[in-house]
């Protein structure tokens, strides 16, 4: 699913809202999540998951074409940890324990 499809689905579920308003809301939510992560904050959507950033330290890497050793600089990367409800919905029955 891409962002425009998400906007269409949300707009269809909420016919009282204009398509443009739904698009603005989706963009605002994504902008707020992005701004929070850029500030180093964690964003938790209970039941769905949590977004955070993790530091990847600098290291020595290798160019796959030439085999030449290269220096890879330190960087921050986004990380997503799934929430319990999302995991359970993706894997129904996995958390159920049966007594025999």
Swiss-Prot record:
SMART domains: BHL. One of its GO terms (biological process) is DNA recombination. GO terms for cellular component: chromosome; cytosol. The keyword Transcription regulation applies. It comes from the Bacteria. It holds the Pfam family Bac_DNA_binding. InterPro entries: Hist_DNA-bd (IPR000119), Histone-like_DNA-bd_CS (IPR020816), IHF-like_DNA-bd_dom_sf (IPR010992), IHF_beta (IPR005685). One of its GO terms (molecular function) is DNA binding. The keyword DNA-binding applies. Keywords: DNA recombination, DNA-binding, Transcription, Transcription regulation, Translation regulation. Heterodimer of an alpha and a beta chain. Belongs to the bacterial histone-like protein family. PANTHER family: DNA-BINDING PROTEIN HU, INTEGRATION HOST FACTOR SUBUNIT BETA. This protein is one of the two subunits of integration host factor, a specific DNA-binding protein that functions in genetic recombination as well as in transcriptional and translational control. This is Integration host factor subunit beta. It comes from Agrobacterium fabrum (strain C58 / ATCC 33970) (Agrobacterium tumefaciens (strain C58)). The gene is ihfB.
